[in-house]
Structures are given as C-alpha cells and as structure tokens.
Amino acid sequence: MTSQSHGAPPVPSSRPPASRVPVSGYDSHDSHSVSSSHSSHSPVTTHHHPAPPPPASRPVRESGVAPVTAPEPIAAPEPIAAPEPIPAPEPIAAPVPEGLKSEHKPVEREHKPVERKPVSSPAEKSIPASSPVHKAAPTPAASHAVPTSQKSAKSTPGSYAGIPSLQLIDGNKEFNPDVSSYFKKVHLDRAGLDYHVVAVFGSQSTGKSTLLNALFGTQFDVMNETARQQTTKGIWMARAQLEAPHSANSAHSQDCSDSGVLVMDVEGTDGRERGEDQDFERKSALFALATSEVLIVNIWEHQIGLYQGANMGLLKTVFEVNLNLFATSQNRSLIMFVIRDHIGATPLANLSTTLKTDMGKLWDSINKPEGLEHAKLEDFFDLQFTALPHKLLQPNEFYADVEQLACRFTVPKDPNYVFKPVYHRNVPLDGWSFYAEQVWDQIEQNKDLDLPTQQILVARFRCDEIAAGALDIFLSLLVKIRDQLSGGAVASAVLGGLMGEARKQTVDEYDSQASRYTPSVYSATLEKLEDRVDNDLGKVYQSYLAQLKRESLEQFNAALESSSALTFGENLSRASKAAHAHFIDNAKQVTAAIGQPNSSHFSYDDTLAALEQELDTLRDHKSKVEIDRLISRSAKRFKSSFHEEFDENLNKPDETVWDRILESFETLLNASIKKIDPNYSPSAPSAFSFGFGSPKTSAEGLKQIQQEAWAVFGAELKELSKEEQVLSRLKNKFKESFRYDANGVPIVWRPGDDIDGAFAKSREQALEIMPLLSTAKLSSGKSIEPTVALEDDEDDDDETAFAVILTPKRQASLIEKFKKQAEGLYLEAKRSTIQSTTQIPLYMYGLLLLLGWNEIMAVLRSPVYFMFLLVAAGAAYVIHTLHLWGPLTHMTNTMIAEATDMAKAKLKQVLNEAPTGETREREAPVGSSRDDVELKDL
C-alpha cells in the first residue's frame, strides 16, 4: 500500500546550515533489498549502509547490524513503477478527492504472520514536482499485511510541530493518563497499527535528547552545557518529524515512509541528582525495552569496554527481569548502539565486536527462568551498530551522518531499515496507552528491580551482625529459663518475668547499636529479631501451658477420686471449675508477665480449648462410669426384691396373679429410680436427672434402668418356663388340695376314705393354673409387654412374645408328666391305707418279753451293756426332741448309697480285671412276682 507523502519539516534552529549529503543511490534491483536483507544477515556479519563521500579530514564511518535468528524471509513484491504525478497547484493536506485514484492496484503481500483484515490503500495524491519531499515506500506494516487507518486529513509536520512533548512518566513514577489526548493532538489517534515506537537509553548528559532532536526533528529539552545538570526527568514522548534526504539526487527521495514514529526520551542513568537510588533507572530502562521496537543505546566511544560506564550492570538487571516478565510474549526488539564522538582510531567493526562480546557475556551471566535456561540473546534481540562524529568539533559531518542514519527509520528499502514487522507489538495505537500503563504497573510491582543502595547494604550487614550478637545473649538466657522450667514447679509470674526480661534485654541490646542505621533496615531487622525471640520464647511458653494442662487434669481426677459428702454431680462440677480456674489463672499471670498480650506466640487460647475438650471427655467418661454403677446397683436391688415378689405371688396363683406381679414390678421400679432422683415422677419421666451430665444422658440412663428392670422380668418368665418349675408348681398345687384339708392339716388316709374323688378333684385344681403359668396375661385379658424396647426383642416382630411362657405343645407335654407324678402320689396314699390295716398282734409283745427275758436281764446286770443302753436311749431322746430323725435318716441313706456306689465301683473294677472269656450270668430270681417288683420300686 502506498503511503501518503508530506512535506519535510524545517531543520531545527540549533543545527548549523550545512548542505545535505545525498545518500548513495540504488540500482534497479535494490527495490528487493528489504526482503533480501532478512535472509542475508547472520549473527556475526556487520552490514554497512551507503555513506556520502567522506572528507579527507575524517575516516569513513560504518554502521553494522547483527541480527540474530531472523524470521522467515518475506517475499518482496514485484517492483511497481510509480505513476506519473498528477499536476496540482498546491500540496493538498485534505482527504483524497474522489477523482484522484491510483492507476494500479495494491500489491498483495505473500508473508502474513498476523492475520488482519486488509484495508484498501488510499489513492496516491498528486504532488508538485518542485515540492522538496519524497514519496514513501510501503511501510513494514503494509508489507506485513498490517492495516492502517485511512486518515481523513493529512497533516503536514508544521501542523503539530508546535505541540510540546508529553511527559509519559514523571520523576515520581506516575503514569500520565492523557496519552490518548496527546495522540489526537499529533494526529495519530486513527493510526491503528501504522506507527512505531523508538526509545533512547544511556548515561546522563551524553547527548541523548540532542541525538533525538537531530535524528527525528523533535524538540526535547537539551542540557545547558554551562550548568551540566539533569534536563530530562522521567520519560518524555513526542512524535517524530521525519524528513526525506534533501539531495535531489537521492535515490530514496521517493521512497520515504510516512508512518507515525513515536520517540521516547528516557531519563539518563548514573545522574548525581538520584545518587545511589537506581530504582527509577532500572524501571525506566525496562519500560523502554519492553514497549519500544527500537532501543537506541547512546554511548561514547571511550565508554566501550567499561562495565559501569557502559551501563552493563543496569542492562544485566533489565535483561534478567525482562526475561522473567515478558518472555512469554515472544516479542523481539532491535538494540541499536550509537557510538558518539567516534574519532576513527578504532574501527567500528572492532568496537561492534567488543560490544557484542560484552553483551554475550552479560546475557550468559543472568538468571534465566525455568524452560529458558539455554535461551540466547539472539532469540530475543537483534543488534545494530553505528557511529557518529563529534557534534561540536565536526558539526557538518555529524549532521550528514545523522541524515544517513535517519534513512534507516524513513526508507523501508534501506538494507538496515529498523522497523521490521517482527519488532511491532501489534497493539493498536488507541490501546497503546492502556498497554503501556499495564506494563509500567507490572514493572512497578516487580521486586527484582528494588536492589539496595550501598547505604542500605551496609545497614543490612551491621543490623544483621548486631542482631546476631543480641540473639546470642538471648539464647544464653533462654537456656537458664528452660532449665528452671524443667527443674520442677515454677510460679507462673516468675517464669513470665524471666521470659519478659530476656526479651527486653535482647531488644534493648539490638536497639542501642542498630537504631542509628537506615530506619527501614533497622525496623525490618528488628521485626525479624523479635519474631525469632518470640518464636523461641513461644516454645517455652507452650511447654509451660502443656504442663499447666497436665496439672489441671490431674487436679480434676484427684478431686473426683477423693471422698466427699457431696453428690457425684456436685463433685464433678466443682472439680471441673477448679481445673479450669487453675489453668486460666496461671496462664494469665505468665502472659501478663511476658508483656506481649497481642502476640500470637503468647496466646493460650488453643491450649485452653484443648483442656476444655479433654475435660469434656473426662466428664463424659466419669459420668458414664457413674451412671453404669448406679444402673447396675439399681438393677441388683430391683432383681432381689422383684424375685421375692414374683415367687410369692405365683405361690398363690389365681386370675389376678399377673396384675399383682405387674403392680409389684412398677412399684419396685419407681422406688429404684427414686433412689437416684428423689424428684422423679412416673407421670413426668422427662424430668428425671442423675444430677450431672446432659438431659440427653439422663434420658438415656432412665431408659437403660427401665430396660434392665424389664430384662429382670423377662428372666423371671424364662425361669418360670423351665420344666421343673412348672411341674413343681403344679405338684405343689396338687399336694395343697390332696394332702391337706381346708385348715392346712395333713390328711391321714384310712381305709374307706374317698381317695379317688379327692385325687380327681386335686388334679383338676392343679391343672386350672396351667394357663396362668403359660401366658403373662392380666385379668383384663391384656398381655404384659415392656414399656421400653429390649435389646433382645429388637428383631422380634411378635408384640406378645414377651408374655408367652409356654407354647401349647409344651403345655401338653408338661400336663402328661404332671399326671404321672400325681398318680405316684395317689399310689402312695393307697399304700398308706394298706399299712394301717396290717398291724402287729398284741400277744407278740408278750412272747417277745418272755423269750427275751434272759437277754434283758443280762443287759441290765452288765455295766457295759447298761451304759451303752443309757447312751443309746439318751441319743434317741435328743434326736426325737430336736426332730432330727429325718436328717439322720437322710444322712444314713446317703452314706449307705455312697458305700453302695463305692462297692459297685470296686466290683466293676474286679470284673473288668477278670480273665478274657470268663462270663458271668445274672439271672432274675425265679418265681418273682410283679407285686414284689412294684413293692421294691416303691
């Protein structure tokens, strides 16, 4: 796209009148040099641009570029012959008239690394042949397919030449918010991407502003050489007023670019005004490097080879931070070294080699972020080198070389043209203000640029040294404090006083020596020292709190175990309060004595919370143990009482027996609960309380007491369901009617009594209680069921399972067994009547006396026999008087049975030891009758 041309600005008044030296012409094939130069450059090759014939008095100066890995070569468009200009009476600055259109179409570029919408190129405006301007060749933006905004009014340089430059960032590091307004004043508000940014970097008072004014036609303030003081403060910006070469023979007179160039004049480095404060130097240099396409490094020839003089230290810091902050953006920049006051003794090629070597070493020494450890300088920057003679001693040569240098910024066909598409940040100009402000904010927030001054370094060293000495004193005091704490019990106020005194002595020791150094360093080191001291004292403090907690817990346990007239609940509450108060009082004393109540190192809140948690756990455990003890004791007391009531009621079974049993159960249960809580009422069970613990614990305890009571009831029913229990109660009921009369007098059966009728009646009465022994049912017909769920019955779906004692099948089996036992009693009664009829005749007693008279007299006459008779008679009398015949008979029978068993065992042993084959046959006595067998069994 062909850019519109404009008139050349006037030469600044400071420039002495000198004839322009034309730039060497190009051959016809030079129209392709822009593209071919990309591919021909190598990292070590220095390129020279054409220069005017040098005077005899000075050597020819060269300029070189050391581009690094170049981007893919951009195919150059076919050269297009410019159309003949259309005659026009005056240069026109207004928009292109409708009738004036270019006769050729815009050339379509092949290389488009960034996709943008193409914009039709405006028609070329006719210019008078006598006008001293040249036609600009397509800008890099055009060759890179970057659209440019179509300007509504083309301004000549004179239309904004009087506008002063803008202070982009002031000396206080504040970004100017009026940047967009300035762009509008200099007619760049619609430039879009058709603009370029150039910045200058160098030491103070080295002629940076002078170089920019001469090179770009700007009007930056320059130094008053009689005063030699700082002129540029902060970062200033102005629009360049570029001119074409003045020589009519210049081959570039028709190929100059009209792209808007913004020039940033950066405050010089190493100025006496800022002294050791290099913060702004670093940040301004980094800002210039990050936002500009071309960074001009203004350096005197005698500074080359120096480290500080050539700003190598500053460049190292800037490169390192730039790599960390902006490496991901993958932007490239051109660093152009302009060597001032070049006298020619050292060729430019040698100076360039020295600078490239220094830059390479500098790049290798920086700390690179992860993933870029092997990155090279050439991956991010291209280098160019040029030299200028002394401005005051050789003014004509100086301005001639400046004019040649300007071709690199104005003529895209120049082999060393600087505004390559790869350098552009691709930020439209209407958004550049926001972009630059964000870059500045990011630089401002980066701490890597806040490097200390020598004064701060000294302050840091001395403050650290003093703090280390004070810390040694503190550590010696800390050992004594720890020994005293581990030696045994120590008063909290005493321990806190020792800790507070150690802290104060340490801080005073530091303060007495370090307070005269830089306040910020002094305060920062003091803060670190206090944090270290508080951290170490905090460990001792926490150890003491742990000891206090153990003491409080031991005191709690001792108070509970000690005998007291108080109830368990009252004793538990008193012990908890005493343990809590013991910890709080001592913790407050030691904290107050230290004198740091707001420090997080001396807070007992966490330990207090841990103590309260452990006290809660202990209270719950002790309460559970006490509740279990109360429930167990209540259950034992209830079990013994209820067992007696249960048996007593079942001994007199009738239709209301279970009503009486249930009433006894409830009475005993309520009495047992009232032993624990005298205020308990069955109508308000929720009011029950153990006197300690939570209401939930009391409710669960009451339920457990009721469950234990019903479990006892269930155990009694299970005991009742046993076979011997049922048969015993049926048999007792049968005997009560069969053997005793209505007055409870034993019945002596005589011959002729109706034993059969009495037997049938008694058996019937005994069987009548069988239903009562089979189901626990009230007289109303309702079965007895527990009022609380029992653990054994949780999986039982039958609600009446608790009341069932005997199943119908078991009832039938037990009735049959009972009848057999009743029949045995019936036979016994029958035999007693037979024995009463079979008595000894009276004459037998007479015969016994007559026949035994001699034996009787022998006994009476013998003292031994007589004494034996008296003893036997006395023993019989005593046994009879004490009613011991039964026990004696039982004992005798037992002894006989034991003797019989032993005899049988011995006999069996003898038989087992008999020879094999020998058999013994035992036969029943012949002639034994059935009655004899039955009588023997009876």
UniProtKB/Swiss-Prot annotation:
Its EC number is 3.6.5.-. Residues 603-630 form a coiled coil. Residues 146-158 have a biased composition (Polar residues). One of its GO terms (biological process) is endoplasmic reticulum membrane fusion. GTP binds at residues 202-209. The keyword RNA-binding does not apply. Residues 74-94 have a biased composition (Pro residues). Cooperates with the reticulon proteins and tubule-shaping DP1 family proteins to generate and maintain the structure of the tubular endoplasmic reticulum network. Has GTPase activity, which is required for its function in ER organization. This is Protein SEY1. Residues 33-45 have a biased composition (Low complexity). It comes from Yarrowia lipolytica (strain CLIB 122 / E 150). Residues 1-159, 911-938 are annotated as: Disordered. It is a multi-pass membrane protein. The lineage of its organism: Eukaryota, Fungi, Dikarya, Ascomycota, Saccharomycotina. Keywords: Coiled coil, Endoplasmic reticulum, GTP-binding, Hydrolase, Membrane, Nucleotide-binding, Transmembrane, Transmembrane helix. GO terms for cellular component: endoplasmic reticulum; endoplasmic reticulum membrane. Residues 861-863 are lumenal. It is found in: Endoplasmic reticulum membrane. Belongs to the TRAFAC class dynamin-like GTPase superfamily. GB1/RHD3 GTPase family. RHD3 subfamily. It is an enzyme of class 3 (hydrolase). GO terms for molecular function: GTP binding; GTPase activity. Residues 1-839, 885-938 are cytoplasmic.
